[in-house]
Amino acid sequence: MGALDDCLIQGDRYLPLDYKTRGYPVKEETPSYYQNQLNIYTLLLQENGREPAGCAYLVFYHPLEQNDGSRITFHMHPVKMDTDPERAREIFRKAVVLLSKRSCPPADGECGFCEWATRVGPIVSA
């Protein structure tokens, strides 16, 4: 997640727009991976006095072909997504609570990061 790529203005409402470049066509579940990012952009717009429209756009690009060795043709796939700034606010609240604790929470068997940390921990500390 970085800075907002673009912002559409519809009347007095603001719609975040984020560009994504991939090496392959968008899979059905891919847009959902960016839900938190779009919710956070919406919250930041709201907190800065801009009325969010309640939705945002992801625009995915992937290469179709390379012409003449120097020109690449891309396919564009826009996806409209509903946004909820209150879900972003809740993420921030939970982060503050977690960061204020003196120790890390116990590992969760379903957490990919916990699994990774368990595997690399011995390597890193060696």
What residues fall within each predicted segment?
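Short, solvent-exposed loop/turn segments at secondary-structure boundaries
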Residues: 28-32
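An active-site-proximal "capping" alpha-helix that borders the catalytic cofactor pocket
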Residues: 34-46
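Metal-dependent nuclease catalytic regions and adjoining charged, substrate-binding loops involved
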Residues: 44-126
